[in-house]
Design a protein with these regions (language model features):
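Helix-adjacent hinge/juxtasegments
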Residues: 57-79, 88
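Charged, gly/pro-rich active-site loop segments
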Residues: 2-3, 76-153
Length: 153
């Protein structure tokens, strides 16, 4: 069975909405790949993230904003014959998005982004205190290109 290319934007966005986390990959200052799992929010072809303004992720993004974000969901192990290793496979739905990380500054803009992130996980509004908003790093990725694939569906 071959994997199926997903070309429908609405189907790719449906896959993204089903994911609880994503993996964001970047290239560090030594030219080596660096990938980390993250919580996220998604709205109108923009992916939103938050984290500490200190550390490797922040340093890497400041040096090179090019990123690739991978979403994967609906994993299900399957096999034709459980005694034949090569008949085992994994069903999945996935999306890969490419873009550039852009840091968000200013309390109102940060809060807007944090609300988009939180709306992915909870159907309610939140309040944020000034020190938390001031200290958090918020960045967004405008999707430049998106590719989807499914296998077994």
């Amino acid at each position: 069975m071959k994997n199926k290319v997903v070309t429908s934007k609405s189907e790719m966005e449906s896959i993204i909405r089903k994911c609880q986390t994503c993996s964001i990959s970047m290239v560090d200052t030594e030219g080596k790949p660096y990938v980390i799992p993250m919580n996220f929010g998604y709205k109108e072809e923009v992916i939103y993230f938050h984290g500490s303004p200190k550390g490797k992720k922040a340093d890497v993004l400041r040096n090179n904003p090019n990123v690739c974000v991978m979403f994967s969901t609906d994993h299900q192990l399957r096999y034709v014959n459980e005694d034949v290793a090569c008949s085992w496979s994994m069903r999945y739905r996935s999306v890969i998005a490419y873009g550039k990380a852009e840091f968000v500054e200013g309390p109102k803009d940060k809060i807007d982004c944090l609300n988009i992130i939180m709306s992915h996980y909870a159907d309610r509004s939140f309040e944020y205190n000034d020190p938390a908003v001031r200290e958090v790093m918020v960045f967004k990725v405008q999707v430049e290109k998106m590719e989807g694939r499914t296998y077994g569906y």
